[in-house]
Amino acid sequence: MLFRSVRTAAPIVPRQNRSFPGAWLLSGKNGMTIELECEALLLFYETHHLPEYGACRITVDGEPLNPPVLHSNSIYGWGNARFVAAVPPGSRKLHTVTLEPTEGSFYVLGLGIC
């Protein structure tokens, strides 16, 4: 794995999840771009039923993820972590992952890299 960069103006804020004590808070124009060489990438995010939890559009190498928008507001959310395979397992290569918040607050808890 080779990290090239993580570019964001999003603040890191404390969370009450013991496994993920801090998170990047994506909202408004504070998105995130990750450049790395990997075989697979998991993106962990927080879900909750509170109305301020929003959504985030994700593209990988310029192509929308399927589904293209992750919703962190869920009637089943209670501050728990969920994940999405932003880069599904495959051959190792350089990837650019872009996260653009579309509404509300979106908390990125961590990255799983292989």
Predicted regions: what they are:
Residues 6-16:
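Extracellular glycan-recognition surfaces and repeat-rich motifs
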Residues 15-36, 51-56, 80-84:
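Short beta-strands within extracellular/lumenal beta-sheet-rich domains
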Residues 46-114:
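Beta-strand-rich ligand-recognition modules
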